[in-house]
Swiss-Prot record:
Function: NDH shuttles electrons from NAD(P)H:plastoquinone, via FMN and iron-sulfur (Fe-S) centers, to quinones in the photosynthetic chain and possibly in a chloroplast respiratory chain. The immediate electron acceptor for the enzyme in this species is believed to be plastoquinone. Couples the redox reaction to proton translocation, and thus conserves the redox energy in a proton gradient.
Domain of life: Eukaryota
Record gene name: ndhH
Enzyme Commission numbers on file: 7.1.1.-
Name of this chain's protein: NAD(P)H-quinone oxidoreductase subunit H, chloroplastic
A Pfam family assignment: Complex1_49kDa
Amino acid sequence: MTASATRNDLMIVNLGPQHPSMHGVLRLIVTLDGEDVIDCEPILGYLHRGMEKIAENRTIIQYLPYVTRWDYLATMFTEAITVNAPEQLGNIQVPKRASYIRVIMLELSRIASHLLWLGPFLADIGAQTPFFYIFRERELIYDLFEAATGMRMMHNYFRIGGVAADLPHGWIDKCLDFCDFFLTRVTEYQKLITRNPIFLERVEGVGIIGGAEAINWGLSGPMLRASGIQWDLRKVDHYESYDEFDWGVQWQKEGDSLARYLVRISEMTESIKIIQQALEGIPGGPYENLEIRRFDKVRDPEWNDFDYRFISKKPSPTFELSKQELYVRVEAPKGELGIFLIGDRGVFPWRWKIRPPGFINLQILPQLVKRMKLADIMTILGSIDIIMGEVDR
């Protein structure tokens, strides 16, 4: 075969589903002209487990352990959205102490998720050292989770009307110590990474998304805020107790992979600010709204009867969903995590539609990698931050 015959031949390369840079079981069919990417087709579904259909055959309390398997690196957010939806359907009030505890857990989970994005992202583009550093801090967060919930991952901690258990003795002091320590670690990350010339060469100007383009594609989270759009659901939807704390929306206007890195690094610092304020101002009172027992079939319980005092201290699995529909969302580490819930006067949801941020954000990947080099696929995909358990559901 002559050289002229092969010069214009395109090559098709399969990346994944086992390749470590695919962050799970994502498969990309990439068409190359030399080193230049001509086309990229993501193949999904390798981790599909029918999560939406399972929800239609479980009560909310029975379904809670399943939801932590969507985004298994930020499980507090999947739990939060699962209990927020029936709380809004039933107009259930969450005690102030429980709301503060939720905020603390959510922000710790956000930091843990961003840390486990940072390490593999840098490993993908050739920097191995931070990959080991981030696990050092992440272990401290998991120790806090274990002390409060009994589980390092898959916590099963949130409940309709509050949380499963109060914070143990000494936990608040340990968490404050972690916050002070972690701020010094973030400074270390920035010294090590942010101005590293090799890192900047790999990420600056790579995978640029404009603000209007990000909105048109339905992007959310750091992907959207790195394109100059100051949109954060914690500010927009005023859920939990976020309005009571002093913090700012972190954003950049460049829209490239470096901007997405800077947004996430800044978000970790802001999360620490929120956690510190919540720990210092956490009120007393109950950690769970026991009044939600009235949503059971017995409308007027005897407050001193045997069932209430010794059995029904926790939300009943027979919590009924009224005949309504609503969309509930939270600001997860990867973007807008939403649930479209339809109740049908039964204990099971009639429809439970999940809006995963990773799945929506992944849509733009084929457009971003076109006319880029093959090595830039790892940079761009890493900067999107996906978890396949959430993408495939």
